[in-house]
């Protein structure tokens, strides 16, 4: 049931009972959100019960560290600390949803994406593949928006490369970070796919 709801959703709100800690069910749902490439907000509820005698700043820092460590696969998702019982932080959820909708329309064009990718390669060229002298070459990139995302466009960045098997997870993450630095879009995943293409030049 949760899988179907996630697939239908424009934005997924992952609610965590921080008093109980991050559970296996939370991780499972977060994994589905990541697999589906869905925009997401992490809502940390019952924040008032989390180390109530500590300062809010220290509590926020500890919660964020825990959330980012255990739910690293949805690191793009902003998190909001709330207390439903005290009605604290609830209004922020709607503000963040509005921001995600707005920022989703401020993503790089194909031309901007290619300039960014080329600059990223110049700054940090791909290393040789393990056990091989071959190196990844990214010829160009395109941006495609999946038609199933009607309200909030989620771009799919397609990289045309010499050999897609040379695109490592670490280099993909490097490119994601560069895109996020240039075009911050909290809550929106950065999704890559690679296609091998032979060039004669």
Residue ranges and their predicted role:
Residues 4-14, 19-201:
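C-terminal-of-GTPase-core extension/linker across diverse P-loop GTPases
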């Amino acid at each position: 049931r949760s899988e179907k709801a996630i697939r239908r959703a424009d934005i997924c709100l992952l609610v965590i009972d921080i008093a109980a800690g991050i559970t296996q069910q939370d991780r499972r749902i977060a994994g589905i959100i990541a697999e589906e490439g869905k925009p997401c907000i992490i809502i940390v509820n019952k924040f008032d019960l989390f180390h109530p005698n500590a300062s809010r700043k220290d509590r926020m820092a500890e919660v964020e560290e825990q959330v980012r460590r255990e739910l690293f696969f949805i690191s793009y998702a902003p998190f909001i600390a709330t207390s439903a019982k005290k009605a604290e932080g609830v209004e922020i959820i709607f503000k963040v949803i509005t921001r995600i909708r707005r920022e989703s329309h401020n993503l790089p064009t194909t031309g901007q994406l290619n300039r960014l990718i080329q600059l990223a390669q110049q700054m940090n060229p791909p290393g040789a593949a393990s056990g091989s002298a071959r190196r990844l070459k990214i010829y160009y990139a395109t941006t495609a928006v999946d038609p199933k995302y009607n309200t909030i466009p989620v771009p799919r960045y397609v990289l045309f490369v010499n050999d897609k098997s040379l695109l490592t997870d670490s280099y993909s993450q490097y490119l994601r970070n560069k895109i996020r630095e240039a075009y911050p879009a909290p809550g929106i995943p950065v999704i890559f796919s690679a296609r091998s293409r032979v060039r004669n030049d």
